[in-house]
């Protein structure tokens, strides 16, 4: 009913949303175009007595991948391109110079797909953007225990030693490098080549250092160590610096100079990068060229001057959590840094090979790509920033690609991150979402980019604003993107103060939206302005910039929540996170109450299929759509040819999380299309919009206690109409191997006369299950035999086999069977052949209906577990006879403060009755106080008038209605809030969680049952549970749990046989964990044993642990 309804807008934003995954694609493109060349240019040429080998940074090429993206997934390989680099060899032989250029294979570079992820070993992976401290110099103030003030300057680099300048209580400035002892700034500066005269003349306040030196020299302990403060010469300074940096190694002036150069001035070992140099120059007002990425003496001199200025009250300390001091490292930059590691390893390998005596080895053996490939494989396989892509639904995929993580190499760790790093900083407005972050130890460390945010060339986050002049918003100049630092210098106002009603009317009537008469202006009343991270009140004349949209401060997932401003932030966080956990349903349905971003999220996440160009649809089936267009053959001729493009659809494919990826065509044949038109819907979209759940008729009321504590009561209509039925595809794999007794074999010839043939019924002649077969638990998916060792036969058996012509079984059946609890249809079978092995993948699709124990949630953090499924005739029903689909607990609203769900369900009811879909964007108070309430009441009143059902809007209790009990036919005593809510079914399903254990595996050391469903484990009886048994005096039950049900090895075997044979249960023995504890104490050289004292002789005898019962 809702599918073809009209979507009505309640707001209009002139600025179109950017491509939401461009951050991934742009970064990788930059790596291919510039990053590769940069890293190749940093490889040092190899020189010998008569040759020179150079890697050319230009002319490299990438070959087209051998397999397509889909084939890479099926064959469990990586989607990558071979990198070929030109290598120039200059050889001098008997006075002649020979130059040869060869194209050498340098390994395979994984390629990013058009959707912004990688295919590594058949699995989709995402490289998460890392937000780190930007390279540069940072000043901070420190207070010691005696409340004395000191200052510190930290120089952060991309690569190399960390350097810190700090003042002490006497005012002296010291330098620390890595873990070396502190060194006087005068020694460092003079060792770098500056004279004392230059140093003191360059400082604005040299008297500060003079005074500090006088105070130190007045102290006894420094009178004999003057050389540690003031060097006599440059040589003296170099030698003293070397003794501090390498105290255990003897050296001379030349060695000291080399160590200093390698520490701070060697571009291969120390690098502040372009961003670091720009920040150093800006902070210290230096004229150093931007291509110089190492430290210079002038950097130390200017940092010293700034530190002295801080002591005199000049300058400012830095806020390290401000976004101007942080930058984002995207996929391309992270891969580039890993490629650098691989090239450095290759360089060392090549140096080692050419240093051997003999002829110059061949180029293919010299340029072995293994170090480069190993480095990339290590990054994609084990780096915490390379993650298994969340493919539960398109929104989860999109959010994963826009994630910002402070963790990973070069970042923070969960243990060391304090509250200051995790908290919301004012500079994050419009750049990082203040709501969407995980719950738990990663809270605040992992975030999500705001909807309109983008990255600049330095990795800084920028936010768009419209410029304002004298209260007029300059739309015609488009949005201006500001960094956090630039935003601090101007006065801005939020985008939710613009009244856009005139603009919407003009757009609806087809008039120019930039007409001064209709475009929004700032209101002539006191406004809440923001400048330098502080709020204050002012007039529209003080405003420099205005936000482009009310939702620009939040992320994509959060902006999909209607009436967000009426929800508590904690519940909005849960709602944002749980939308990503929604399972794609068999029958999709777009929400009645949306926010307007549903279509763009579906398109940018790759959830729908769009036309690649303008043309006409000439062929449609379940697997492909053909779009035909005409292209001119020659520019000057009139001849034209037809160009056809095949758009292939994904059909019943498995996602990383086991959900079903399926695209179905919705475009009719012979339909003209333009570029970007919708051709096919995905498994989580409806009509091109993201559709993660269903619109249900809900009632907020208690029902026999079945919705106590967030439990959810549902109607059986949800099952019979397949409203929440979802498809889940599981992949089962078999690999044949060569054993020492012979090769394993996939075959159908396993069944013997005495065997049950039923489980083998679906195998084809190859021994692999047929596609389309319906399989049950225990059915054989792949028939496989493994050779086993034959026993020596007796003469009698040999005679029997000779008479009847039978041979003994020389193999055992190791077939792959359907596990317990799984039944479904085989949707695909794939075979991958290698030189020695054969791998077969079987994909089984399960259809899961909603059941008791499944988790459901709304978009406002209102989550719960299905507790009971009630016949539809027993559910409460409306006054027109419509039974309610779901009953929720009304006590779940007031304390959680997520009132947005009430607004949503009431407006949804009005929209459903009027046949409308409504787009309601957040922060609508610009239209007046209580704007949401007025909108809801107006729509409910309109619905009651249009339909004639006046009970939809009762002025005595608006938003509520009298319900009738389906069991008795009596009307409930009080009016109940009813409405259409958009409810999601989450991936936390009872089928994946329910588990029971009778007997199973035990730990090898403690002999106690393992834990967890995957290991067929049991439930742990912990310390507090033991106390509970003790408190109730249940001694025998406790003894049984701690012994035969746990780690009394002999006892558990005896008790099982006793129960089977009906004998009396034996006595309990000693737990194995007790023996382990005694052995561990003995391993600590403690003489501890177990002794028995005889009652008759009173003699004490030691009991052997191994013989102990």
Swiss-Prot record:
MF terms (GO), sorted A to Z? DNA binding; DNA-directed RNA polymerase activity; ribonucleoside binding
The UniProt keyword set, sorted, is: Chloroplast, DNA-directed RNA polymerase, Nucleotidyltransferase, Plastid, Transcription, Transferase
The record's section on SUPFAM superfamilies has:
beta and beta-prime subunits of DNA dependent RNA-polymerase
First-level EC class: transferase
- Report which residue ranges the record marks as coiled coil: none
Annotated localization: Plastid, Chloroplast
Q: Does the keyword Plastid apply?
A: yes
Chief place where the protein resides: plastid
Q: Which domain of life is it from?
A: Eukaryota
Q: Which GO terms describe its biological process?
A: DNA-templated transcription
The reaction(s) annotated as catalysed by this protein in its Swiss-Prot or TrEMBL entry are: RNA(n) + a ribonucleoside 5'-triphosphate = RNA(n+1) + diphosphate
Listed as disulfide-bonded, the cysteine pairs are none
The EC designation for this entry is: 2.7.7.6
Any matching Pfam family: RNA_pol_Rpb2_7
The record's listing under CDD domains reads: RNA_pol_B_RPB2
Its GO CC terms are:
chloroplast; DNA-directed RNA polymerase complex; mitochondrion
- UniProt record similarity statement: Belongs to the RNA polymerase beta chain family.
List the PANTHER family hit by this protein, alphabetically. DNA-DIRECTED RNA POLYMERASE I SUBUNIT 2
Assembly state and interactors?
A: In plastids the minimal PEP RNA polymerase catalytic core is composed of four subunits: alpha, beta, beta', and beta''. When a (nuclear-encoded) sigma factor is associated with the core the holoenzyme is formed, which can initiate transcription.
Protein task: DNA-dependent RNA polymerase catalyzes the transcription of DNA into RNA using the four ribonucleoside triphosphates as substrates.
* Name of this protein: DNA-directed RNA polymerase subunit beta
Source organism per entry reads: Nephroselmis olivacea (Green alga)
Q: What is the lineage of its organism?
A: Eukaryota, Viridiplantae, Chlorophyta, Nephroselmidophyceae, Nephroselmidales
